[in-house]
């Protein structure tokens, strides 16, 4: 699963996702993409599950790019532990996804295959998404 090799600090503030995505809103690599419509934290497990669903449907033909990276450590305290005594340990890694952010890109497959593969991948994610494609020049 995806996670940073090393970080400057072990734990981060929770933070909020305000407004729309500042960058990463256009297709850079593939001809088709999956774009987020609402703000949410997407975990490394969800990203991996979506990637597996997409590649499995494409039968390993074509190419997949993951445009988001889980660099936010999410902490949690063990169950039945009283409040206080410091922040919990890092439980999992997540990526903050703002509306308009392209999360996955595909290339080398027909449009109907790409559309269905991204639909299956989107089912693994906790947010509403939209299928986008490169405009023919």
Swiss-Prot record:
NCBIfam families reported in the protein's UniProt record: rplP_bact (TIGR01164)
Organism: Bartonella tribocorum (strain CIP 105476 / IBS 506)
Subunit structure as annotated in this protein's UniProt entry: Part of the 50S ribosomal subunit.
Cellular component per GO, a single term: cytosolic large ribosomal subunit
Function: Binds 23S rRNA and is also seen to make contacts with the A and possibly P site tRNAs.
Alphabetic keyword roster: Ribonucleoprotein, Ribosomal protein, RNA-binding, rRNA-binding, tRNA-binding
A Gene Ontology molecular function term of the record: tRNA binding
Stretches that traverse the bilayer: none
Listed GO biological process terms: translation
The keyword NADP is annotated on this UniProt entry: no
CDD domains: Ribosomal_L16_L10e
InterPro entries registered for this protein in UniProt: Ribosomal_uL16, Ribosomal_uL16_bact-type, Ribosomal_uL16_CS, Ribosomal_uL16_dom, Ribosomal_uL16_sf
Family, as annotated: Belongs to the universal ribosomal protein uL16 family.
Protein name: Large ribosomal subunit protein uL16
Pfam family, one: Ribosomal_L16
